[in-house]
């Protein structure tokens, strides 16, 4: 065999080996969520996707499925459990039945503002919740802002404590949330987000409660008249991964994944306040009647729901709740 043919054969063989090795090393993960494409959390996941590929030189990439492409929040949690997807980004309430300790950051009227809320979740409180999630097979990758939740309804403006009486309000599957609305005399109903629009349109529900950004992206203004700024709960979005699938990644890829997600979470938090204000203004412009809650009524609502803290302590113990209250003080 000529020297040229031997050299050419060696180059071809080397190229094949390198291509095979590169292919074997490349991995792709899938992450699913129920937030619309327009929501800041979904945009943040696209930042994560780009950053992850850049950090790993394309050796670890991600496919992102927002807007319930792979099902709703419950289905996404089940998919993480089964290993069908690497992770999900969802409101923490959808994990609270698996990890009830998450309700410790769902206390009514607990946070004065988003800065205080993130001070708490970024403290030892977050570490304690992460440990509880890990026990159930979930690795926490970060907490984004879902935001202050506000009530909409079709019955009447909410200008007093009495105005909440008897309202059929859709809630998330979070027992602390449900108990809080029972305490103010409302009739809360847990329901998946997919059914809420039609339920309000048909009069099965009087209203619902969500951050302004969700009310806007779900177009609830089309079937709701009255908008308020109750801000009764501050809600987080947790990015949770399958412990088994996360641990199957190399140490370098785990580090890259966490670093990419940290950048995405920081970006989303920086945009959330702007998104919140813009969404509220858009809802009012669309024709909703906006009635701000007075300081006096807010104080009455807080007083009416104060017993929820004691009930939750009986359910999950005092340690995490006391840690939350300590950070708040």
Residues of each region from the PLM?
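Bacterial N-terminal signal peptides
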Residues: 9-19
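Sec/Tat signal peptide C-region and signal peptidase I cleavage site
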Residues: 18-26
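N-terminal secretory/targeting leader peptides
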Residues: 26-116, 124-125, 131-329
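Positively charged n-region of N-terminal signal peptides that target proteins for export
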Residues: 1-7
